[in-house]
Amino acid sequence: MAIRNLRFLGDELLRKKSRRVEKIDDRIQALLDDMLDTMYENNGVGLAAPQVGILKRVVVIDIGEGPLFLINPEIIEQEGSYIEQEGCLSVPGRQGEVERPYRVKVKAQNRDGKEIIVEGEEFLAKALCHEIDHLNGVLFVDKIIDVKGE
């Protein structure tokens, strides 16, 4: 396990769409472990593979309830509306209010390749949407309603 270098706003890679993971092998397992370590080291609650320079559809999230490892995640249901402050490890020093769904249901594979369904409301829904946006080349600054910080 290793701490990987983060990519920051202005890096073109963050604006590219990530590719599906076709095979969950040792490299993907190592990526998941490294992403989790990198997220914790930087006091984050979520991290997407593009943030460490890898254009794969891989996300890790931990909102304080233990880590979620999501491979090829996709939102299959969403409802309601929820506006709250967001920040991002790839956009240091900047926050803003973003509108997200209040509740989402996400289909993904876990690190063992098993299909899972993750349902989240409020903070978890926000984290899921934020990280899945990264996989599509979208940053929270693209969705800001009200800007805070630099």
Curated annotation (Swiss-Prot):
Keywords recorded for this protein, A-Z: Hydrolase, Iron, Metal-binding, Protein biosynthesis
Reported cofactor(s): Fe(2+)
Active-site positions on this chain: 131
CDD domains, per the entry: Pep_deformylase (cd00487)
Domain of life from the UniProt record: Bacteria
E.C. number(s) listed in UniProt: 3.5.1.88
Binding site for Fe cation: 88, 130, 134
Function noted in UniProt: Removes the formyl group from the N-terminal Met of newly synthesized proteins. Requires at least a dipeptide for an efficient rate of reaction. N-terminal L-methionine is a prerequisite for activity but the enzyme has broad specificity at other positions.
Protein name stated in the entry: Peptide deformylase
Species of origin: Clostridium tetani (strain Massachusetts / E88)
Name of the gene encoding the protein in the UniProt record: def
